[in-house]
């Protein structure tokens, strides 16, 4: 009865591992006991090296350090390495003038593979779902095994070794940072300072999924329609950000005695950021040996990029008062402006052609454990009661949200309007 319902001969012809005829050319390729997970995994070693030098005297202190780390991944051809260099110093130019300086550089390189649940591009996932009956490599006519990777099997599952050996998943990060803080103490109660910080970050990423040994991937548009098939894929991205920060401040402690302590801080902060990014994606290069974006099919290639700038500034004030070191009062006020705020922002203070947000707060505290009636309570070391009220805000908006009225969109994949 079953033979009437299903044609077994057709099934054998389509699934070679069901055919035990050793004279067939496909027998060796479909009668194996391959441990795919073992083939793509390996033992991994991690190395860490570091050098640190410290020195100085009563006038100047310095510290210099270099560190290097290299860690191999458990999947073949994956690894991570990082180099970091840092120098910082503390210099007393005079009894009143002090200068702090810090400079650092770090770079890292991560060679990785897709490790998610992806039946086309994840070597780990493919090694778990691919049948062990198939050979990872093709066989020559004389029956010897070649070095050429086997293609997609009859079940439509690709070769995970192709992703390990031929794909590219590279991420490179760079960071350079400088901090400087000169300060001058007029007295032991009055100090002024200016902190400057400059940070440069860059990220480069490269991705390539080969065609050899892997299934084609359908490309779907916004309507869910397949418009092409991807044999191989290239992705490149670059992002670069520069950040500058200034903070000019005054610290004043007009009252310091055993009963009263009053510390006042006021200043001005300025932040400036610039971000540049580029992204490109393409499909179907003429060969897996040509894995650059320019070699992809032009109709299946897309690029994008952006340049964004944003700034913010703040005038701030902070007052801390202590009475007998157990009754505490704190008052904070900040006036913030941002390039992301519209000039006519509702509820904002309009001044100097800018919209300012006012953010005050006040808090009071009582260190109960410092009271006389608490000294005999041994099981309690510290008890403090706090009450506070404040207003807060942020500039978590798109950089040009207050200026954009019209945006261009892609039409039918061929025009912008």
What does each of the following model-derived ranges do?
Residues 347-360:
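Short turn/helix-capping motifs enriched in Asx and small/polar residues
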Residues 50-54, 65, 88, 179-181, ...:
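Outer-membrane beta-barrel architecture
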Residues 66-72, 329-338:
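Transmembrane beta-strand segments that form the barrel wall of outer-membrane beta-barrel proteins
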Residues 1-32, 73-78, 84, 88-177, ...:
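Surface-exposed loop/interface segments of Gram-negative outer-membrane beta-barrel transport/assembly proteins
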Residues 40, 48-70, 74, 86-92, ...:
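Predominantly transmembrane beta-strands of Gram-negative outer membrane beta-barrel pores used
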């Amino acid at each position: 009865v079953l033979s009437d319902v299903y044609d077994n001969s057709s099934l054998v012809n389509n699934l070679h591992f069901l055919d035990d005829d050793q004279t067939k050319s496909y027998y060796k390729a479909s009668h194996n006991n391959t441990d795919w997970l073992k083939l793509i995994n390996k033992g991994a070693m991690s190395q860490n090296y570091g050098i640190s030098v410290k020195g100085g005297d009563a006038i100047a202190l310095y510290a210099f350090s270099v560190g290097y780390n290299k860690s191999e991944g458990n999947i073949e051809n994956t690894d991570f390495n990082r180099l970091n260099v840092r120098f910082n110093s503390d210099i007393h130019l005079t009894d009143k003038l002090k200068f702090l300086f810090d400079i650092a550089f770090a770079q890292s390189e991560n060679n990785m593979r897709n490790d998610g649940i992806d039946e086309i591009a994840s070597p780990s996932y493919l090694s778990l779902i691919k049948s062990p009956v198939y050979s990872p490599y093709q066989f020559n006519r004389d029956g010897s095994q070649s070095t050429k990777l086997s293609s997609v099997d009859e079940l439509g599952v690709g070769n995970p070794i192709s992703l390990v050996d031929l794909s590219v998943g590279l991420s490179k990060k760079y960071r350079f940072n400088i901090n400087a803080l000169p300060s001058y103490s007029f007295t032991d109660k009055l100090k002024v300072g200016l902190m400057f910080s400059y940070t440069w970050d860059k990220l480069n990423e490269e991705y390539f999924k080969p065609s050899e040994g892997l299934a084609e991937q359908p490309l779907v548009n916004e309507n869910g329609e397949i418009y092409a098939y991807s044999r191989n894929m290239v992705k490149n991205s670059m992002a670069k950000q520069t950040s500058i920060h200034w903070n000019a401040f005054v610290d004043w402690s007009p009252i310091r005695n055993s009963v009263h302590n009053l510390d006042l801080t006021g200043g001005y902060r300025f932040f400036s950021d610039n971000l540049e990014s580029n992204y490109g994606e393409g499909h179907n290069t003429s060969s897996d040996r040509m894995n650059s974006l320019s070699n992809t099919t032009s109709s299946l290639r897309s690029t994008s990029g952006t340049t964004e700038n944003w700034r913010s500034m703040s005038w701030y004030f902070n007052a801390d008062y202590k009475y007998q070191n157990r009754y505490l009062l704190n008052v904070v006020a900040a006036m913030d402006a941002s390039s992301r705020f519209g000039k006519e922002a509702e509820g904002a203070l309009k001044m100097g052609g800018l919209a300012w947000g006012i953010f005050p707060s006040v808090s009071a505290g009582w260190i109960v454990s410092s009271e006389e009636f608490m000294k005999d309570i041994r099981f309690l070391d510290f008890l403090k009661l706090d009450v506070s009220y404040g207003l807060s805000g942020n500039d978590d908006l798109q950089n040009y949200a207050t200026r954009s009225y019209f945006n261009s969109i892609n039409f039918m994949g061929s025009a912008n309007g």
